[in-house]
């Protein structure tokens, strides 16, 4: 069943009729080994190893794939695996602008959904061929049970050959990637797998939430970050930083582990001081770009109004959060995955709300940030940008081949 059609997919290019603004045509996918008659899926399981490289070589200009940070494995991958049935039951409404994008694509288009979740957009345009992937095995199982063409894969390492799809979408995915390099890499992957002239739609949570009260329900990651991921030997854990009430976290330093060092043995958390520094992140790991002197000097200001204004500015600069997911006690999975999560400390009980509470990691995007990342992708251009339902959204078009 799953992906059988892809193993024998013709390399012939189809001439498709144009229907609307997004006029595209199909390409090809490289071979993928997936057992269609069993429960096995293509996987990059972090339980087995840090990452599984399944992509073919591509342009040297692409950002290098980093080792999956511990924060993503624990507070994204494991959380969504645990809450998958409940999460899926709450995800059925389709965003009108995403639907409009998909419906504008011509008949016969191959559409790749990177981070498809429960597959609510797969098959939205019945005249197109959809393939979804997600890092969560349970969510992919939900899609597979509905007969959708899906596989387990990482957004920063998509398992498709170059120029395979006619279009790609990434809906509410990039904000779960914890470093700028990984977010940029995910964009590069989306562009890589669509053919020249193809389109990519990306949506991310915005720092500028329409309902600002939501921010009060989220946990800023600064204190948690220092406590669990930085480690005692880092300048980030100095008394000046630790006791600074104005400390905010705009980004998480990049971690880079060589393929020979991808295993972190018996470690619950990665201490950044023990990981080789990448060139881009040296200053961040030393705390220089995360806590500029202008922030530290706020505590020395005498004028109370100035301090309040500075504090408000710092709150606005906060972009790293834990966002709670409340899983009701009556849900069946509470006795399964959630029991294990409670025992391991991944989740906590909230008897007042009658729920098991998980924290999901989010990097919320400030205005212009998504465009800045996308503009660094050399072979694509931004053709549309908009703000929708507290999300920043862009449409990219991959450069068409020169017609000589």
Swiss-Prot record:
InterPro entries: AlkB_tRNA_MeTrf/Diox, Methyltransf_11, SAM-dependent_MTases_sf
GO terms under cellular component: nucleus
Chain's role: Catalyzes the methylation of 5-carboxymethyl uridine to 5-methylcarboxymethyl uridine at the wobble position of the anticodon loop in tRNA via its methyltransferase domain. Catalyzes the last step in the formation of 5-methylcarboxymethyl uridine at the wobble position of the anticodon loop in target tRNA.
Keyword field: Methyltransferase, Phosphoprotein, S-adenosyl-L-methionine, Transferase
Reactions mediated catalytically: 5-(carboxymethyl)uridine(34) in tRNA + S-adenosyl-L-methionine = 5-(2-methoxy-2-oxoethyl)uridine(34) in tRNA + S-adenosyl-L-homocysteine
Example GO molecular function: tRNA methyltransferase activity
Record's subunit section: Interacts with TRM112A and TRM112B.
Source taxon at top rank: Eukaryota
Enzyme Commission number: 2.1.1.229
GO biological process annotation, one example: methylation
Pfam families, per the entry: Methyltransf_11
Gene: TRM9
Name of the featured protein: tRNA (carboxymethyluridine(34)-5-O)-methyltransferase
Top EC class for this record: transferase
Gene3D superfamilies: Vaccinia Virus protein VP39
Modified residues (Phosphoserine): 238
